[in-house]
Structure formats: C-alpha cells, structure tokens
C-alpha cells in the first residue's frame, strides 16, 4: 500500500463552503495512544499511513530508537536523548531538522524538543513539544503513532498537529511542509524497516 495522506480539514471545509451536507459515513476515528491524541482544535493537523512489510518488533524498534533516526531519516540532522533508557512517559529527546525558506520565513534549522506523553510497546507512542529556529517557531507539535499488525507486515498510521501564532498566521504555507514531512518520514521508516 503506498503512502496515503489525508488532510483532515479539507472535506469539512469544502462541505461548509458549498453549503452541502457531507454524505453520511463514519469519520475515521482520531489516532490516539492510551486515549490521548493530537490537538483536534489545532488549525494545522495532518494524518498519513503506510504498510510496511516487516515484523512489528522491527518497525517498532526502528521508530522508537530515536538515536538511530539520523541514520535513516532524511529530515533529521541530529539527535540527543535527554533521558536514559527506552521511551517512556516523561522521557525527552532533542533533534534538529532543516526548514526551507518560505514567503514568510527564512531557511532555518528547527530544534525540536519532544517529550513522550504516552507509550504502549508495539502499539503506539505520543509525544509533544516545541520546534524553534531563527525566524520560525511552532509552539507545540503533538505527534501520535499507531502500529497495527496486518497480514504480511504492519500498518503504521501517524497524525500530527501544530499550534502557534506564527504558523497559524499562514496555514496554507505551513501545511505544505507538515503534510509532505509526514509522508517522507513514513517512506523513510518503511525503507529502513524493510531493509532489516
């Protein structure tokens, strides 16, 4: 299954703009980890998923071994764990990622400080924190990952929300980076896990 992206707000926005009721169908349940999800009130959030042909323990290990991210994830320049041991509620890690110039912000490097909020081994993980760089600030990103065993591999679903005055002032530009960023992360995770 190729990487599939769903911009959650578009169907609601389109239905609201044209004044037509959306067809009756069950909306996909928001992603959660131990009952907690992204900020559903955030202007910016995006969901994506992929199928990975690898054992669940392999996919989980690749994704949750944050010190290994720079080796397989193109968008991660550096990583530092701020707490020893495996990911658990309260553990923190700091990583950097390049952010290209936009019409309203310069090219910069974001320093992301993530704090794990929820984790259930081989099932889900949720973290949140700010991403700050010269000329660009995301006050709080919230990121949820779900791992579901499937025939021949694992379905990985992820959802992320961003909040902050600067990025909310230009959501059309911000979503151009949030959406492809998640798709790239999933593609890199798929490649790394399937190669093991």
Which functions belong to the PLM regions below?
Residues 24-83:
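Hydrophobic ligand-binding cavity/cleft-lining segments
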Residues 81-135, 191-196:
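Glycine-rich portal/gate segments that line the openings of hydrophobic small-molecule binding cavities
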Residues 128-180, 184:
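Beta-strand/loop substructures that line and gate deep hydrophobic ligand-binding cavities in soluble
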